[in-house]
């Protein structure tokens, strides 16, 4: 059967499941589709947080039900991204997050597509495929966001 998982950004993920699947199984399927580790996922249905060992049937989750996915950050690091207008955006990251992932988080909060973002830290423009750790970005670090318009490099 099909169920839907709605994320905080409003994105809806469609999953193929059985009612005998455990919540663990569902989280693994979400990881396959979205790359979010199960230990960072909290699934909510009818206002209740779902426990890993229970099955969809235990919660009376039927075909075309919608679950809500909330992310829990374990040991997350809070950084700030400062825009040219002086606005500061707080973002939770993991040291292993790529710069591209950080740009996606900026997009979630500000609606600016990653392709238009240039992130600067310690005077350097950050490469998308590098991680926060590669640049020694840690809690309290402030990145500067510069906008690149119309495909400029």
From Swiss-Prot:
Presence of the UniProt keyword Transferase in the record: no
Entry's Gene Ontology cellular component terms: cytoplasm; nucleus
TM spans (from-to): none
Keywords: Cytoplasm, Isopeptide bond, Nucleus, Repeat, Ubl conjugation, Ubl conjugation pathway
Positions of the propeptide segment: 153
Covalent cross-link site, Glycyl lysine isopeptide (Lys-Gly) (interchain with G-Cter in ubiquitin): 48, 63
GO biological process, one term: modification-dependent protein catabolic process
Reported function: Ubiquitin exists either covalently attached to another protein, or free (unanchored). When covalently bound, it is conjugated to target proteins via an isopeptide bond either as a monomer (monoubiquitin), a polymer linked via different Lys residues of the ubiquitin (polyubiquitin chains) or a linear polymer linked via the initiator Met of the ubiquitin (linear polyubiquitin chains).
Protein name in UniProt: Ubiquitin-NEDD8-like protein RUB2
Source organism (scientific name): Oryza sativa subsp. japonica
Lineage of the organism: Eukaryota, Viridiplantae, Streptophyta, Embryophyta, Tracheophyta
Gene from which the chain derives: RUB2
């Amino acid at each position: 059967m099909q169920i839907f998982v709605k994320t905080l950004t409003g994105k809806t993920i469609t999953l193929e499941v059985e009612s005998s699947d455990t919540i663990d199984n569902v989280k693994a399927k979400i990881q396959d589709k979205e790359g979010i580790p199960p230990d960072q996922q909290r699934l909510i249905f009818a206002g209740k947080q779902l426990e890993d060992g229970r099955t969809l049937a235990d919660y009376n989750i039927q075909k075309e039900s919608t679950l809500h996915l909330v992310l829990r950050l374990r040991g997350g690091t809070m950084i700030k991204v400062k825009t040219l207008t002086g606005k500061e955006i707080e973002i939770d990251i993991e040291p292993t997050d790529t710069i591209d992932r950080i740009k996606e988080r900026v997009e979630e909060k500000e609606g600016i597509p990653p392709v238009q973002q240039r992130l600067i830290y310690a005077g350097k423009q950050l490469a998308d495929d590098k991680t926060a750790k590669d640049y020694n970005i840690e809690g309290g670090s402030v990145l500067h966001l510069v906008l690149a318009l119309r495909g400029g490099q």
